[in-house]
Structure formats: structure tokens, C-alpha cells
């Protein structure tokens, strides 16, 4: 018997026969902190210290990325009560510090404070990650909320839950700038992966939050993911916002590589040419909306050589599992968030759901031809 697995494009949400929701304005699409159930991916072409406030002001959860120096990363996150990303070796150093070992002095004093730490690695199935997670959660010097991942085996949820991890990033190989699936063959269709993890969570009475990370191609995929996920993490869609961290250039031409047109302005191949400064973004967005200017954002996976070099200029370069390309700027964060909030409210009203918790229990989905779901 063939065990079919599904991606977001393979399914569609069926409205409830009857809905108690008279207007989508009656629904509550926010979490307990009054934020949307969405995280901006900690990628260096999505999030930077200059746009943290932009995301937070628009009710988008954000993680301080690893491209910022560790001292500043920790302080930025602590001041805003948000997550900061660390490598697994940085997580081990923090564990050493709070356990009283002699370590590098750049780690600030953690005693008596509350921190939110995201162990940001590609392969979240390593025993090494689980070991450091247990150390961080068992120490008594400070209160740590821990996010980790990514995982793509449903049963790994059990190990994360038992290790005390609070937020689990789910999904490998589905990002638009990720080449892991195509080059390694490692992949698990996202919708089925989330469903199976959610069922394991319910069966064992788990508390860890599920974050759907990757394969989000548009608004509707967010609504589909939230049937089983507590949050959705977004990279490529946020890169298309004028406020994103990617290098911002303007021009209408494409760069032709091996006969394929990719989103790279010809004049910026090596120098990034006509780069737009952040202080000019509001004026530029006005010109974009008026159809007077075409603007591009550089987007790249965090497993690219360029991104790894940005994290550590002394990094030993290896074979990349990501790609670099340009995307056209299509909106500002405020406009995107207004759309997504209304679309999520609408999906909730169709499925007889006043809250996100009710939404998880409500939707019926059907498998359908991808051709009908475009």
C-alpha cells in the first residue's frame, strides 16, 4: 500500500456546513502576546537590527539573526523580550557560562534574567543539539525559553519535547532559497509532516509549539499550515517587502546565466550598483506603488557561501546548500500584514473558528489536483 504524503499545494480547506461567525471581525487571529502567529525567518536578507522594530510594530514575531555580533544580539533580544539566534557552538558556550565554567567573556551575565534562545541550525536531528538543549533547560541561573530545529521526522518531536525545547522549527528543504532537498534527497512533504507531528503532540500531551518553517509560497499556505502549526516562519515573502534586510537595488534588466533569466539587475552583478539606502525606503515605496520604479531585493539561503561568510568572515567555505537570487519588491510590511490578517480572519470565519485554538480543531481538508490549486 502506498502511503501518500502531501504538500500545501495538494490540499484545500473545506468550509464548515454552518458557521457561528457572523463577521470575520469577530475572530481573534493573534496569539497570547497579541502578535500574529508568524515569525520572520532569521536570515540575513530578511532581518537586520535596523528592521526589528518594523516587524514588531506590525505584530510579526522576529528573531535577532546570527549575522549580528553575539554581545549585541543578546542585548537586542533581551531589551525587546524576543529570541536571538545562536549556532550550536554558541549555545554550548552559553551552557558552559550558566553552569559556571570558564569561557569567553563576550557572553554577558545571565544570572537572574529571562532569555529566549533559538538554536539556529539546518539539521536539528543531532544528538549534540539535544544534549545542549537539556543543559540549557536544566540550569537554575536564569530562565531560558528555547527554540530549536529544523526537523523533518515526525518522531523527532518526541525527543524535542522530552528535552524541554519550547518551540520546534519543522521542515527541511522547502525554502525558496534552499537546495537541500534537490541536492541531498532529504525531504518530507510539509502538510503531512505538520499533521503527523501535531498528532504525536496531542497523543503525548506535549507543550512544545510547532513552527512551520519553509515551503510558504503565498498567503493561502499560511492558513493551511496553521491548521496544525502554532506559528509559521516566513523568509522569501518577507524579503519582497521594502523593509527587508536584502541589498536593495533598482533596474529592469535580468542577468542571463546558462540561458536562464534570474532576478539580478545586470549593473549590479559585482558591485550591487545602484543600491538604495534604508532612509529612502518610504519614498521608494511610493514610487513602486505608482508604477514609476522597479526595485529588487537580494535573497539568499543561509547555507550559501555568501551568508556563511557574513556570519563569520573566517568561515571555512564549503559546498553550498542554498542559492542567491533577486526578487522584485512588491509591498511594504504594513500592507502585507493587513492582507494576511484579513485572509486569516476570513479562513477562520469559513471554518467556524473564533480563535486560533478553535481553528486547529475545525478545518476539514481535501486532497485535490495541483492544477486546480494554482
Predicted regions and their residues:
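Active-site entrance/lid segments in N-terminal catalytic domains of soluble metabolic enzymes
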Residues: 1-209, 236-241
Amino acid at each position: 500500500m502506498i502511503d501518500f504524503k502531501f504538500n500545501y499545494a495538494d490540499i484545500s480547506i473545506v468550509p464548515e456546513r454552518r458557521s457561528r461567525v457572523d463577521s470575520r471581525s469577530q475572530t481573534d487571529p493573534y496569539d497570547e502576546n497579541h502578535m500574529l502567529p508568524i515569525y520572520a525567518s532569521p536570515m540575513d536578507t530578511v532581518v537586520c537590527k535596523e528592521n526589528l522594530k518594523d516587524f514588531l510594530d506590525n505584530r510579526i514575531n522576529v528573531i535577532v539573526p546570527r549575522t549580528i555580533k553575539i554581545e549585541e544580539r543578546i542585548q537586542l533580544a533581551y531589551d525587546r523580550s524576543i529570541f536571538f539566534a545562536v549556532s550550536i557552538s554558541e549555545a554550548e558556550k552559553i551552557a558552559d557560562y550558566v553552569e559556571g565554567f570558564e569561557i569567553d567573556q563576550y557572553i554577558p551575565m545571565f544570572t537572574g534574567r529571562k532569555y529566549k534562545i533559538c538554536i539556529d541550525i539546518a539539521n536539528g536531528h543531532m544528538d549534540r543539539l539535544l544534549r545542549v538543549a537539556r543543559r540549557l533547560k536544566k540550569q537554575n541561573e536564569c530562565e531560558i525559553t528555547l527554540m530549536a530545529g529544523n526537523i523533518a521526522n515526525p518522531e523527532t518531536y518526541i525527543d524535542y519535547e522530552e528535552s524541554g525545547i519550547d518551540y520546534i522549527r519543522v521542515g527541511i528543504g522547502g525554502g525558496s532559497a534552499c537546495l537541500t532537498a534537490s541536492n541531498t534527497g532529504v525531504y518530507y512533504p510539509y502538510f503531512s509532516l505538520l499533521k503527523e507531528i501535531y498528532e504525536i503532540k496531542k497523543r503525548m500531551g506535549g507543550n512544545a509549539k510547532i513552527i512551520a518553517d519553509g515551503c510558504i509560497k503565498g498567503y493561502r499556505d499560511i492558513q493551511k499550515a496553521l491548521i496544525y502549526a502554532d506559528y509559521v516562519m516566513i523568509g522569501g515573502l518577507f524579503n519582497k517587502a521594502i523593509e527587508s534586510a536584502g541589498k536593495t537595488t533598482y533596474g529592469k534588466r535580468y542577468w542571463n546565466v546558462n540561458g536562464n533569466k534570474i532576478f539580478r539587475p545586470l549593473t549590479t552583478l559585482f558591485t550591487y550598483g545602484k543600491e538604495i539606502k534604508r532612509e529612502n525606503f518610504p519614498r521608494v515605496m511610493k514610487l513602486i506603488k505608482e508604477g514609476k520604479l522597479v526595485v529588487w531585493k537580494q535573497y539568499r539561503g543561509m547555507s550559501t557561501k555568501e551568508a556563511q561568510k557574513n556570519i563569520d568572515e573566517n568561515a571555512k567555505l564549503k559546498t553550498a546548500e542554498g542559492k542567491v537570487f533577486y526578487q522584485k519588491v512588491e509591498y511594504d510590511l504594513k500592507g502585507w500584514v493587513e492582507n494576511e490578517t484579513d485572509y486569516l480572519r476570513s479562513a477562520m470565519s469559513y471554518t467556524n473558528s473564533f480563535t486560533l485554538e478553535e481553528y486547529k480543531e475545525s478545518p476539514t481538508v481535501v486532497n485535490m489536483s495541483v492544477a486546480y490549486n494554482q
